[in-house]
Amino acid sequence: ARFFDFSDPLYLRIFGRTLYIAAITTVVSFLIGYPMAFWIASQPEKRRNSLLMMLMLPFWTNFLVRTYAWILILRDQGVINTIWVGHIHNAALWLENTLPWLPLEGFVQVTANPLPLFGTTLAIVIGLVYGWLPDMVLPCYAAIERFDGSLVEAAQDLYANRMQAFIRVIFPLTLPGVIAGSILVFIPSLGAYVTPDLLGGAKSVMIGNVIYSQFMSARDYPFGATISFVLMALMLAGTLFYFRFTVAGQKGEPNHG
């Protein structure tokens, strides 16, 4: 009966939403974390340690405190919307009165209302990226630091420009770090429930919230265990993919997927 309930389209949509949010979180973390790791690795050795310390410093505080900080930033009366509705709206009104020939009426109307940030999927992604970004940066940094810079010089001797050297030499050789960071971000994002509970809304429920409600509110332990098992299987699949990729890379064998 519990597997029949699990086949309900509602839970399938929640699982799909969870995979989507976890994937977006992983991609955004990569787009931010890889350039950050590359920049840190390019700094002098003494400065690298300081930069890594600065990266980790905010994460010495309690996770709930950091999440509540994003509530203060993203809510309708938060920092972003205070600037948006206050300063930017006033600036738009001033420009409209000073330069009436500019088509600013639509922009003035938009800035009159708060941005719908809190209680959305965007808020969840922001919170998750902020929470797991070091897990992307550190593996990428380790892979980039081990990279032999003479290979880039060899590629340039063969008339490769910077972009070609990055695509054909640097990125493939640092890909294990990217894969490791992606797994370290994707797996905890799949099981997240505190961040979507605090930053998300009713339309942004993730599977972690469903598991929590099944155990703590509905007291439906069999169904909660069923969902937990499926989620664990997804996490295990991601972990096995990582190990298969790294072992194939170490043996020098092509990975045929």
Give residue ranges: language-model regions.
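Membrane-interfacial helix termini and adjacent extracytoplasmic/periplasmic loops
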Residues: 1, 12, 67-129, 163, ...
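Interhelical loop and adjacent transmembrane-helix boundary motif
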Residues: 3-6, 10, 196-244
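Transmembrane alpha-helix signature in integral membrane proteins
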Residues: 9-39, 53-54
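Alpha-helical transmembrane segments of multi-pass integral membrane proteins
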Residues: 21-26, 37, 55, 127, ...
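Cytoplasmic-entry segments and transmembrane alpha-helices of multi-pass inner-membrane transporters
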Residues: 36-73, 152-153, 166-167, 175-176, ...
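Membrane-helix interface segments
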Residues: 43-51, 79-80, 120, 150, ...
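Transmembrane alpha-helices
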Residues: 57, 130, 136-150, 160-191
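C-terminal transmembrane helix and the adjacent membrane-cytosol boundary/short C-terminal tail
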Residues: 141-152, 156, 223-257
